[in-house]
């Protein structure tokens, strides 16, 4: 199959967020992120600036994030800024994004 370079370089990918719970276990929750594909140079540059700048560049949407009352939290820069203070959430998002690179390496 031929490689087709697409103008719109986004993709949806599942994100697992593992948070510590009582009893020495982790609770895992999942949501779907919409990521923007970055070029290697842009990714490397943003990686040195910090998690929030990287998140702002790669995460452009989500589905499946609710508040405590079960209401969906729509994606926004304000919501992203709030979530970026949660180290478990940030780890889940960045792990999911970088995992796509690993899959590309393994398959090629």
Regions found by a protein language model. Give the residues of each.
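Short, charged/polar N-terminal "headpieces" of proteins
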Residues: 1-46
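Acidic, low-complexity intrinsically disordered segments
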Residues: 45-108
